[in-house]
A protein has these predicted regions:
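Flexible, glycine-rich phosphate/dinucleotide-binding loops
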Residues: 12-13, 40-42, 110, 154
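Helix-loop-strand module that forms the ligand-binding subsite of alpha/beta enzymes
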Residues: 48-132
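Generic recognition of short, well-ordered alpha-helical segments
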Residues: 16-20, 45, 73-77, 157
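N-terminal beta1-alpha1 ligand-phosphate binding loop
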Residues: 1-37, 166-167
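N-terminal beta-loop-helix "entrance" segment that forms/cooperates
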Residues: 31-54
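Hydrophobic/aromatic beta-strand patches that form the interior of the parallel beta-sheet core
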Residues: 4-6, 32-34, 61, 102-104, ...
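Glycine-rich phosphate/pyrophosphate-binding loop and the adjoining helix
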Residues: 22-26, 128-175
Length: 175
């Protein structure tokens, strides 16, 4: 199983969880980690390069901290530019058909806030629905996300454990 992780954090150097995840995932031969803000500091995305990379992998993982109930802006821009009509969707757009899409998400708040009646009023599953809809449109299989809740309450041990669990999770077969 070849896995491409697109790590999207605008301040990766000062990140706690996402940085630890990148460091752990980079140790695995079948996982390629690309930090999009580092790759494109000017946000000028090389669409052809990104499409070619996506075609080489079985599973694509979007890794990001939840920002305002969504992803950081560069991931949205990446989707807008890379997942084009005729390549990712439409009658001729089948480049990603049969591949898998997974999310690896960190949140500042604890899990209890992400449910009906919780502080955020919606479950993480509801908040991530646009990614599932995108996956459906482009013919990918949407896999259950890996979520690390409560970053602001986590200690170093929690973070190290989460990184190892993520590495195991994104490599496991789901079908």
């Amino acid at each position: 199983l070849k896995v491409l992780v697109l790590a999207v954090h605008p301040q990766m150097d000062t990140s706690v969880v996402n940085k630890a995840w990148v460091e752990e995932l980079s140790k695995h031969d079948n996982i390629t980690v690309r930090e999009l803000y580092k790759e494109y500091p000017d946000e000028a995305i090389d669409v052809a390069k990104e499409q070619q990379l996506c075609e080489q992998y079985d599973r694509i993982v979007f890794q990001f901290p939840l920002y305002w109930y969504s992803s950081p802006p560069l991931l949205k821009k990446w989707q807008d530019l890379v997942l084009t009509y005729g390549w990712a969707f439409g009658s001729e757009g089948k480049a990603l058909h049969g591949k898998e899409l997974m999310l690896a998400v960190s949140t500042g708040s604890e899990a209890e806030k992400y449910q009906a009646g919780g502080g955020n009023h919606y479950s993480i599953s509801e908040l991530l629905k646009p990614f599932q809809a995108t996956s459906n449109l482009i013919g990918m299989t949407y896999l259950p996300p890996y979520v690390f809740y409560g970053v602001k309450y986590a200690n170093a041990e929690d973070i190290a454990i989460s990184a190892k669990r993520l590495a195991d999770y994104i490599q496991k077969p789901f079908s």
